[in-house]
């Protein structure tokens, strides 16, 4: 048996590990791209236990669903960045033409008929905000009832959409369904904990800039290290 044949299993193992490394790098790159985008009112983070699963929450600031706080997950395909489109599933029931009323899955084929390597996850996240901010009657629906009401009885559609908003708010403080430390959770406002943070945020910019940070051993007006006399 030749030396090359003996070494082949190790080579295959190394190739597999390298592919995993490249895949993890691709996922980290996608998340970095998400972080640098100016995405309004939507927050996502990969699971601490599974980088193919991302947790997200959308705060809707305008439109029919204004005021809603909708949780969702993004699941990347096993062979990402190749393969099909990532899957978005809402954890809150959302009455919407593009959201499956039974599974909560968002019908992404309307905007991403074919997922390519050049597609970015941040654009998918941006699409989530878009469909909750402005409902387009031209969308190819997955929820036929919602689509029909949008066309024939807008008032009733808006009423059911507002019920989705109300339900989402009633679940904001629910305990997490997983022990994953990256799952996004919220707690009620605590005056002792949050008031100092709020005051810091609303502090005038000039005061924050002039605030002393740390210690200095340099005498004002001098560039010589340790020129400042020690004070006790």
Where are these regions (language model features)?
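Short amphipathic alpha-helices and their capping/turn residues within compact interaction modules
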Residues: 36, 75-81, 93, 129, ...
């Amino acid at each position: 048996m030749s030396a090359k044949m003996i070494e082949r299993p190790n080579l295959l193992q190394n190739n597999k590990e390298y592919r995993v490394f490249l895949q993890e790098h691709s996922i980290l790159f996608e998340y970095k791209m998400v972080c640098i985008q100016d995405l309004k009112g939507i927050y996502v983070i990969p699971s601490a236990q599974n980088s193919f699963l991302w947790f997200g929450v959308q705060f809707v600031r305008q439109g029919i669903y204004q005021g809603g706080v909708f949780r969702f997950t993004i699941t990347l395909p096993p062979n990402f960045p190749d393969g099909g489109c990532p899957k978005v599933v809402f954890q809150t029931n959302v009455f919407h033409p593009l959201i499956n009323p039974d599974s909560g899955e968002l019908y992404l084929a309307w905007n991403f008929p074919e997922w390519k390597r050049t597609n970015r996850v941040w654009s998918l996240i941006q699409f989530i905000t878009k469909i909750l901010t402005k409902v387009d009657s031209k969308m190819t629906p997955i929820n036929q009832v919602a689509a029909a009401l949008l066309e024939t009885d807008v008032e009733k559609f808006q009423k059911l959409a507002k019920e989705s908003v109300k339900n989402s708010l009633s679940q904001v403080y629910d305990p997490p369904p997983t022990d994953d430390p990256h799952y996004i959770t919220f707690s009620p406002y605590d005056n002792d904990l949050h008031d100092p943070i709020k005051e810091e945020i609303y502090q005038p910019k000039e005061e924050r800039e002039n605030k002393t940070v740390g210690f200095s051993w340099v005498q004002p007006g001098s560039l010589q290290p340790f020129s400042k006399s020690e004070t006790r």
